[in-house]
């Protein structure tokens, strides 16, 4: 099968990676192929159904593939690790999709590499299917994200903390896998020339219009800050908690990446944490905008030598970008909140209107997704909201203020903005448990609902229901390594 690889990272950035083969697997079996994505990439899904097990397990890579493990560093929970890198993944190449966009193809769970740091480099079935589900859920919501092209069972049992688990490999598609941590890897070694080469490559690949800017590296820093501010605002608007916002998990492209301990919040609480390793709540839902700025500061540090030869002027330029991050984020968040509330135009009091609703939701632990979805029904029937609030009077003072700001077509616009289906934690776990038992039908049904999150259907009612009371209080997510 022809993939038409054009591997610019391997060609242009020698010394930024290690050439490495995928580990052999005993009995690969294609579990699921993302046929719409395959077509988007210009690939033949029928042919991939037949040959995908061999290709996406790494046993028989297509002609032109160049498997490599990328080097990067990163701050993990605030502590700097100078060498991380692809410890269980291989970039096999780049292709151009039907829209003319360059896309990475990466095998995740393909075995040990020089960056594995003692781990086995493999992935278990549960984390692979989880990333497939949540990535497609984010795509359905219109949020920039890496996506899964395929999931392959390897036929190899893996020993994990919870016991023996079947092995699997995910084929991940991304605009690129360049991270803040990629810049940090070379900056930490004072290899300014490679930082410059990486910046030039990232500009050419993701922000080519900046190449002719008076100060292209400063413009690049601003562009990444803008892309990430918009991304995190969109996470917040749907109640998404990434769970591990380390700098090696922040992309230069502005795509969401790495869905290990992520989860969607149900009852609204800014302090919500699901990750089993986030013991201090560093990456709690409400902290994500602050971590956004913190991570961008680390990128700024790596770029300082490119911003100006004078250290003081370079710091001033970096700070001039950092000082805008809060306003960038708030602007995207408020624009999104106006859409979620169905407001007409923009007025000064809109932020307060939104914040007062959130405070009422917090005090009642109201379901994030259903509250905003049922607000569309409340345009004509305020009773639609009452089941979501323990205290029926919680919104009495707020509703008239909201009604005064509604657009004429508010209900229709709100239903197109506020999803009815998200990847609720209990439904994801049910689908994964069934998959472990050999039944992928629940996975498929959930995936179908998540692909159309704004379209409410009677036969998908179960996917809209919150978890049983108390479920999320004890629910914990894991990295899957």
Curated annotation (Swiss-Prot):
Residues annotated as binding Mg(2+): 249, 258
Reactions catalysed according to its record: L-seryl-[protein] + ATP = 3-O-(5'-adenylyl)-L-seryl-[protein] + diphosphate; L-threonyl-[protein] + ATP = 3-O-(5'-adenylyl)-L-threonyl-[protein] + diphosphate; L-tyrosyl-[protein] + ATP = O-(5'-adenylyl)-L-tyrosyl-[protein] + diphosphate; L-histidyl-[protein] + UTP = N(tele)-(5'-uridylyl)-L-histidyl-[protein] + diphosphate
Keywords: ATP-binding, Magnesium, Manganese, Metal-binding, Nucleotide-binding, Nucleotidyltransferase, Transferase
Record: active site: 248
Coiled coil: none
EC identifiers of the protein: 2.7.7.-, 2.7.7.108
Manganese recorded as keyword: yes
Keyword Manganese: yes
EC supergroup of this enzyme: transferase
Pfam families for this protein: SelO
Cofactor: Mg(2+); Mn(2+)
Residues bound to ATP: 85, 87-88, 108, 120-121, 172, 179, 258
GO molecular function: AMPylase activity; ATP binding; magnesium ion binding
Role played: Nucleotidyltransferase involved in the post-translational modification of proteins. It can catalyze the addition of adenosine monophosphate (AMP) or uridine monophosphate (UMP) to a protein, resulting in modifications known as AMPylation and UMPylation.
Membership in a protein family: Belongs to the SELO family.
PANTHER family named among the record's database cross-references: PROTEIN ADENYLYLTRANSFERASE SELO, MITOCHONDRIAL
Protein name, as recorded: Protein nucleotidyltransferase YdiU
């Amino acid at each position: 099968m022809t993939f038409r690889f054009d591997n610019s990272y391997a060609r242009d950035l020698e010394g930024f990676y290690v050439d490495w083969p995928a580990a052999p697997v005993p009995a690969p079996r294609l579990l699921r192929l993302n046929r719409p994505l395959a077509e988007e990439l210009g690939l033949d899904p029928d042919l991939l159904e037949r040959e995908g097990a061999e290709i996406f397990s790494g046993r028989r890579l297509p002609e032109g593939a160049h498997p490599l493990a990328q080097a990067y560093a990163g701050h993990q929970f605030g502590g700097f690790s100078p060498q991380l890198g692809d410890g269980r993944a291989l970039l096999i190449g780049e292709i151009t999709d039907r829209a003319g966009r360059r896309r990475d193809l990466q095998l995740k769970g393909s075995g040990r590499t020089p960056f594995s740091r003692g781990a086995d480099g493999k992935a278990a079935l549960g984390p692979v299917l989880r990333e497939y589900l949540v990535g497609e859920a984010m795509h359905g919501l219109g949020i920039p994200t890496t996506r899964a092209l395929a999931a392959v069972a390897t036929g190899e049992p893996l020993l994990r903390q919870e016991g023996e688990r079947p092995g699997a490999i995910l084929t991940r598609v991304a605009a690129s896998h360049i991270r803040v941590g990629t810049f940090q890897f070379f900056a930490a070694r004072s290899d300014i020339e490679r930082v410059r080469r990486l910046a030039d490559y990232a500009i050419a690949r993701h922000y080519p219009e900046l190449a002719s800017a008076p100060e292209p590296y400063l413009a690049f820093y601003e562009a990444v800050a803008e892309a990430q501010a918009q991304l995190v605002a969109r996470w917040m608007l749907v109640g998404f908690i990434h769970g591990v916002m380390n700098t090696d998990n922040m992309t230069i492209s502005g795509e969401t990446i790495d869905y290990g301990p992520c989860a969607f919040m149900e009852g609204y609480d800014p302090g919500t944490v699901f990750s089993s390793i986030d013991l201090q709540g560093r990456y709690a839902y409400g902290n994500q905008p602050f971590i956004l700025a913190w991570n961008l500061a680390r990128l700024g540090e790596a770029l300082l030598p490119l911003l100006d030869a004078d250290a003081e002027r370079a710091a001033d330029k970096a700070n001039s970008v950092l000082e805008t991050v809060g306003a960038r984020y708030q602007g995207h968040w408020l624009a999104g909140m106006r859409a979620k509330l169905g407001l007409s135009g923009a007025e000064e009091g809109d932020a307060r209107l939104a914040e007062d609703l959130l405070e009422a939701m917090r005090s009642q632990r109201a379901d994030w997704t259903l509250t905003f979805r049922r607000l569309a029904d409340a345009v004509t029937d305020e009773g639609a909201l009452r089941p979501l609030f323990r205290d029926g009077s919680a919104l009495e003072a707020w509703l008239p203020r909201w009604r005064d700001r509604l657009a004429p077509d508010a209900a229709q616009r709100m239903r197109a903005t506020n999803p009815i289906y998200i990847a609720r934690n209990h439904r994801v776990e049910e689908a994964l448990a069934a998959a472990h038992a050999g039944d992928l039908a629940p996975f498929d049904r959930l995936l179908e609902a998540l692909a159309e999150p704004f379209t409410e259907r009677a036969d998908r009612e179960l996917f809209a229901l919150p978890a049983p009371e108390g479920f999320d209080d004890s629910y914990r997510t894991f990295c899957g390594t």
